[in-house]
């Protein structure tokens, strides 16, 4: 499917699986270290938004990288360990539910991305960011790439790291707050989660009070 130039500053057809072509285009311009950036947790009613930044070694790319949403949990876990072993540098950052409520989810996600890039052990020459927005305040130039986790292996790697990190956080949250089943749905608005919120009320610091159906109904 063709995309308009407004969709992304780097225009390609969507491949069957992400590849290294986006990074290679930048490397041809003399840019050496390219970071992929993605986040997990924009939509849930509970928990943080988590962002990851990954700089891959072009000579040792992990096989099987893909958008984290197209992988099973077991496959994500396996690739997560491979990415941490093979990547040049990996960084993760998160913003809490309180931080999300204090601003909004879009700003919080972009800030988490910015912090993830800053946390890398080397300064990347360029950042490829999943979505339509480049986080303000990056320490390097960046490009937004629509469906980037399905187009760039660096972004796909970041999507896996962010997703696995957040899922593990929500498993721990589920153990601390059993009625909500957070370890099952990771904070998303499932029927069980909504029913638990109705019966138990939301948990301050865990639930997002600016998200429906919590917004305006409960005091934080």
Swiss-Prot record:
Localization of this protein: Cytoplasm
Pfam family, one: RNase_HII
Keyword Cell membrane recorded: no
Swiss-Prot/TrEMBL GO biological process terms: DNA replication, removal of RNA primer; mismatch repair
Alphabetized CDD domains for the sequence: RNase_HII_bacteria_HII_like (cd07182)
Note on how the cofactor is bound: Manganese or magnesium. Binds 1 divalent metal ion per monomer in the absence of substrate. May bind a second metal ion after substrate binding.
Chain positions recorded as a divalent metal cation binding sites: 38-39, 130
RNase H type-2 domain span: 32-220
Example of a GO cellular component annotation carried by this entry: cytoplasm
Family of this protein: Belongs to the RNase HII family.
Name this polypeptide is given: Ribonuclease HII
The gene coding this protein: rnhB
């Amino acid at each position: 499917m063709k995309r308009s130039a407004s969709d992304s500053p780097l225009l390609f057809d969507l491949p069957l699986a992400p590849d290294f072509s986006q990074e290679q285009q930048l490397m041809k311009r003399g840019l050496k270290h390219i970071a992929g950036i993605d986040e997990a947790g924009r939509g849930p009613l509970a928990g943080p938004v988590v962002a990851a930044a990954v700089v891959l070694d072009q000579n040792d790319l992990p096989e099987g990288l893909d958008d984290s949403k197209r992988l099973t949990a077991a496959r994500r876990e396996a690739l997560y360990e491979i990415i941490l072993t093979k990547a040049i540098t990996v960084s993760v950052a998160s913003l809490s539910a309180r931080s999300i409520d204090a601003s909004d989810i879009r700003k919080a996600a972009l800030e988490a991305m910015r912090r993830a890039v800053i946390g890398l052990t080397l300064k990347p020459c360029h950042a490829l960011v999943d979505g339509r927005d480049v986080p303000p305040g990056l320490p390097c130039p960046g490009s937004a790439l629509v469906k980037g986790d399905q187009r760039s292996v660096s972004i796909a790697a970041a999507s896996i790291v962010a997703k696995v990190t957040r899922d593990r956080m929500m498993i721990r949250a589920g153990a601390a707050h059993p009625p909500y089943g957070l370890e099952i749905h990771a904070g998303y608005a499932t029927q069980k989660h909504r029913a638990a919120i109705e019966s138990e009320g939301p948990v301050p610091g865990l639930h997002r009070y600016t998200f429906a159906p919590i917004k305006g109904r409960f005091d934080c």
